[in-house]
């Protein structure tokens, strides 16, 4: 198995990212964790770049991965389905003819997830947390699956808006509804990618 280097920006605080790094260190033997300001020699290692990170540094690393797709374990530079998007798909299962709302339009989660779900036959509504008519959308649309990963600390959806939705995945603590999935098997996806 090739070595994995996880690159992050230690100057940026993020509890979710730090928890993910701890889980990776616990589950993947020999992983190296490096600050973007002090990058090691990467050799032939697989790279996982984690946000939050300075935009300039992130774009530089993303460009490197586009030029070296064999090192891109996440999929941000190579165009593969990203780790979190794949983990969500593993959790929700078949989506043909289902309506899925995604509250996240990032390149790492929202866009690749929406694209893959459409290819699998789902009807997808993709938006961000600032969408002005979200209450109306949630109450007037027959939604089968809601994926919320806003990343906004002040964004919250009342449980009355989501109670009729069968499957709710909440990766940013956005939903007041207690009946939800709050984690997806990202470490398992990462392990599978390390093997291939």
Language model features by range: what are they?
Residues 3-30, 80-165:
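Glycine-rich phosphate/diphosphate-binding loop of Rossmann-like nucleotide-binding domains
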Residues 7-10, 173-196:
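Adenosine-phosphate binding glycine-rich loop
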Residues 30-41, 129:
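A short, well-structured beta->alpha microelement
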Residues 30-33, 73-75, 124-126, 168, ...:
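Conserved beta-strand scaffold positions in the cores of enzyme catalytic domains, especially
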Residues 41-47, 141-145:
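Short acidic/histidine-rich motifs immediately flanking catalytic phosphotransfer sites
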Residues 42, 56-63, 152-168:
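Rossmann-fold NAD(P) dinucleotide-binding segment
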Residues 49-86:
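Glycine/small-residue-rich loop that forms an oxyanion/phosphate-binding "nest" at active or ligand-binding sites
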Residues 52-53, 147-152, 172-173:
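Short glycine-/small-residue-rich Rossmann-like dinucleotide-binding loops
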């Amino acid at each position: 198995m090739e070595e994995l280097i996880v690159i992050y920006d230690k100057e940026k605080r993020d509890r979710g990212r730090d928890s993910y790094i701890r889980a990776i260190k616990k589950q993947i033997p020999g992983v190296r964790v490096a600050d973007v300001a002090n990058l090691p020699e990467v050799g032939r290692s697989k790279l996982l770049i984690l946000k939050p990170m300075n935009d300039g540094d992130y774009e530089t690393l993303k460009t490197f991965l586009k030029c070296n797709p064999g090192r891109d374990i996440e999929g941000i530079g190579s165009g593969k389905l990203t780790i979190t998007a794949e983990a969500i798909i593993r959790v929700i299962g078949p989506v043909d003819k289902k309506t899925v709302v995604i509250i996240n339009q990032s390149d790492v989660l929202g866009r690749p997830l929406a694209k893959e779900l459409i290819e699998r036959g789902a009807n997808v509504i993709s938006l961000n947390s600032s969408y002005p008519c979200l209450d109306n959308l949630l109450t007037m649309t027959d939604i089968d699956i809601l994926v919320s990963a806003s990343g906004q600390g002040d964004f919250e959806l009342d449980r009355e808006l989501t109670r009729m939705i069968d499957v709710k995945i909440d990766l940013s603590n956005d939903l007041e509804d207690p009946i939800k999935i709050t984690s997806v098997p990202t470490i398992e996806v990462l392990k599978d990618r390390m093997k291939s």
